[in-house]
Amino acid sequence: MIHELSVLGWIKVFRHSTKNKEFFSNKQDALNKNPDKPEADLFSILDKLEDFRSSDGRFQFKLCYPEATFKSGKSCNEWIQSSNPTQSDVITDFKPVDLAFTEESYGKPWSGLGRATVGGGALIDDSPKQTHWRSAVGVFNKYYVDRFPGPLELKLQSWPRLVEMFVKKS
């Protein structure tokens, strides 16, 4: 999948695997970690997102849970938004492209990612101004043994151990 995505212009900007029970140490750590090792358990170049903003001011993202399959039969959400999720807790100009999972933390329609300002467990999530933090990216609060909060559709026992995030190179 990684090769296929890179051929199609997608750049991996984040990877978190808990196979070795590792978590980021804090929000700053989740912004940049092992920048030259995209297959590392903890990899992030989220601090470089602005480099991938398109000429029309938007980002096209893909958030993938490779070990999960949702009702759609897919494991990734693809969408466009104008807000940088590492900088803003307000998600703006959300446009779905192809959604595998469709509900955010509170059961409302999934509408992108923003910088978490409440909840205290991850850098970004799908309901950044609320206490629940699903679709979490940059988890530094070891929440459940070797797993972290994924999409609402996943129950606690099937929470993910792997998440990857990509941005489309314009």
Residues of each region from the PLM?
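Mature extracellular or lumenal effector domains of secreted proteins
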Residues: M1-S170
